[in-house]
Amino acid sequence: NLIQFSNMIKCAIPGSRPLFQYADYGCYCGPGGHGTPVDELDRCCKIHDDCYGEAGKKGCFPKLTLYSWKCTEKVPTCNAKSRCKDFVCACDAEAAKCFAKAPYIKENYNINTKTRC
């Protein structure tokens, strides 16, 4: 679920504040999303949005699904025991790893999505 996703990001990026830093970043980080991603981090969010979309098509509820995972040396790893839990956990884990590799560009936080996306 979204709280677990936030904790996965904290695992991959210790000291981060996901609910503040990523809730309104670029065109895809946060609720909704459209247009062309503004940078690598925003592309991570688009991939995550698309993954949640695929989970929904499989009959899963990604924003609500609780799963089991662990953090080892800044790497989130899934221990899910069902198809939906495994799929959603993988969406979140891959996104957290993607976030960790992408630069955070302050100018892309809270952008005008009407003109930039």
UniProtKB/Swiss-Prot annotation:
Catalytic activity: a 1,2-diacyl-sn-glycero-3-phosphocholine + H2O = a 1-acyl-sn-glycero-3-phosphocholine + a fatty acid + H(+)
UniProt KW keywords: Calcium, Disulfide bond, Hydrolase, Lipid degradation, Lipid metabolism, Metal-binding, Secreted, Toxin
Names of required cofactors: Ca(2+)
EC number: 3.1.1.4
Domain of life: Eukaryota
Cofactor binding description: Binds 1 Ca(2+) ion.
Record's subcellular location: Secreted
Disulfide bonds: 11-71, 27-117, 29-45, 44-98, 51-91, 60-84, 78-89
Role played: PLA2 catalyzes the calcium-dependent hydrolysis of the 2-acyl groups in 3-sn-phosphoglycerides.
Gene Ontology process terms (BP): arachidonate secretion; lipid catabolic process; phospholipid metabolic process
Protein name, as recorded: Basic phospholipase A2 pseudexin B chain
GO molecular function: calcium ion binding; calcium-dependent phospholipase A2 activity; phospholipid binding; toxin activity
Organism classification: Eukaryota, Metazoa, Chordata, Craniata, Vertebrata
InterPro entries linked to this entry: PLipase_A2, PLipase_A2_Asp_AS, PLipase_A2_dom, PLipase_A2_dom_sf, PLipase_A2_His_AS
